[in-house]
Amino acid sequence: MKLLILSLALVLALSQVKGNQPDWADEAANGAHQDAWKSLKADVENVYYMVKATYKNDPVWGNDFTCVGVMANDVNEDEKSIQAEFLFMNNADTNMQFATEKVTAVKMYGYNRENAFRYETEDGQVFTDVIAYSDDNCDVIYVPGTDGNEEGYELWTTDYDNIPANCLNKFNEYAVGRETRDVFTSACLE
């Protein structure tokens, strides 16, 4: 009887551990489209725009952030890191603002390959987001809702007017039931 109770307790504990991570966090099934280092290096060659998000407030970009974009420089192959230059606006300042962050590819959810980004801001804040899906010109990023962040999803692409269908479909699949808003639009360039 004790063995049965211990077995049930172990099964329950393991299911709760799995329950703390999203369904897409499965390296065997989805790892080919969750390569954080490949995604970071792509930021050096292209500007990426956050075209959609399911949350409004960020500890760095502010409340009701809009017009978020990023480009990278200073690639460090040994650390698997870049210096990222973010541009954004928010409800406190309608002028374009900038933030420089060191972004490092790290592992989350027991993955063997780096599948997440650790951001280190100039003032010492540290945040970690996870790649839910990535392809050549787009990323769907999961913000776990820790470290002062709201939980949600972001859709990033190199062409804000032509969002690749595969990424838009993944974003919509993962963001189902959440309010989605546009972040970077052509209005950001006016």
Swiss-Prot record:
InterPro entries: Calycin, Tick_his-bd
Name recorded for this polypeptide: Female-specific histamine-binding protein 2
Gene Ontology biological process: symbiont-mediated perturbation of host defenses
Main function: Salivary tick protein that acts by scavenging histamine at the wound site, outcompeting histamine receptors for histamine, thereby overcoming host inflammatory responses. Binds histamine with a high-affinity (Kd=1.7 nM). Contains two binding histamine sites (H and L), that appear to bind histamine with differing affinities (high and low).
Organism field: Rhipicephalus appendiculatus (Brown ear tick)
Signal peptide: 1-19
Gene Ontology MF, one: amine binding
Complexes and interactors: Monomer.
Subcellular location: Secreted
Family assignment from sequence similarity: Belongs to the calycin superfamily. Histamine-binding salivary protein family.
Tissues expressing this chain: Expressed in salivary glands.
